[in-house]
């Protein structure tokens, strides 16, 4: 009978296969960079970035992320318009809206355009990470990861 060396229960290539893939859509280069660094530090994979709603929708169709972080105020197509398109074409992908204008959008409108959560940018990125974890945990994350 052949002898097998004991190996890790999870091969090295798949140890982090649980990492949820996130698309960041924000017109601010620095904002995208900071959000991306923060999410990756928290254990998520940033699979792509876009600078406006039109580009973001194209990236979402191409990349099929697990979650989308979307800024409200952007050129060409704002976050509410992009969220509406995304919720229609990709309803299984949760959208988290980041904004400095939370009281302008309103919870009812956010729900109507398919946004799962609104995070005020002034609340800090810890709140964003907690929100992303709560939206992804049931489907994509093992209990001991969060």
Question: Would you name each region that the model predicts?
Answer:
Residues 74:
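Receiver (REC) domain active-site loop signature in two-component systems and cognate sites
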Residues 61-63, 85-92, 113:
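Conserved phosphotransfer cores of two-component systems
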Residues 29-48:
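Two-component/phosphorelay signaling modules centered on CheY-like receiver
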Residues 63-69:
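Active-site beta3 strand of CheY-like receiver
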Residues 1-21, 126-146:
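Non-catalytic signal-transmission and effector/linker regions of two-component phosphorelay proteins
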Residues 52-55, 78-82:
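Acidic catalytic/metal-coordinating carboxylates
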């Amino acid at each position: 009978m052949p002898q097998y060396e004991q190996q890790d229960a999870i091969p090295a290539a798949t140890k982090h296969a649980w990492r949820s893939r996130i698309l960041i859509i924000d017109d601010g280069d620095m904002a995208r960079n900071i959000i991306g660094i923060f999410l990756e530090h928290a254990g998520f994979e940033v699979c792509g970035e876009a600078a406006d709603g039109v580009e973001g929708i194209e990236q979402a169709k191409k990349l099929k992320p697990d979650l989308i972080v979307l800024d409200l105020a952007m050129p060409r197509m704002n976050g509410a318009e992009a969220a509406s398109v995304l919720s229609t074409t990709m309803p299984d992908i949760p959208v988290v809206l980041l904004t400095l204008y939370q009281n302008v959008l309103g919870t009812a409108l956010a729900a109507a355009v398919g946004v799962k959560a609104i995070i005020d940018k002034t609340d800090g990125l810890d709140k964003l990470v907690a929100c992303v974890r709560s939206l992804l945990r049931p489907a994509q994350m093992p209990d001991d990861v969060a």
